[in-house]
Amino acid sequence: MSTVLPKKSMTEEDIKLQYITPAVTSKWSTGKITMETRITDGKINLKGNLVFREKPKRADYLLYLSANNPIAVIEAKDNNHSISYGLQQAMEYARMLDIPFAFSSNGDGFAEHDFLTGKEREFGLDEFPTEAELIARYKGEFGLTPAQETVIDQPYYTSQTTYPPRYYQRIAINRTMDAIARGQQRLLLVMATGTGKTY
């Protein structure tokens, strides 16, 4: 690949455009990838009489099992950092979003943390797992039947008057649907006051 800038001079956005995005889109359908996805609105801080909001947290890439079921997060860094430099940040986002796979890349390759097995590894750009491979690893770990998959893959109710769920609401919905799919007869949903249980 011929580029205008040397790799070490590229910004994070250049690395994403030239290296990471092509590596991911060659293995995943673009309809199951989102970029620069806002995770939080940013922490609200109070300093005296001033109220201000910190910058929102954004995931560079989210890969989806289905519409409301993200399966992997990818954090990109420029090439002046190691392949695994963004892995801790990706893992933080994965924990927040209840996602089983976290990846980071600097354009030379990928580092992966698999929350299902606890294993970490590094591999080349052309070795990124395909959509089918990652989904098979996920479903294989949980041993889902086709009937259970159907329940879990149900889309959320939406209308013109509903807002998209916040990340913690999505987690609560998905965990509830997962428990129902597994045939659990009794469920207890605990969320703090004001967090949107009536979503």
Model-found features: residue ranges?
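ATP-dependent helicase/translocase motor core
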Residues: 1-199
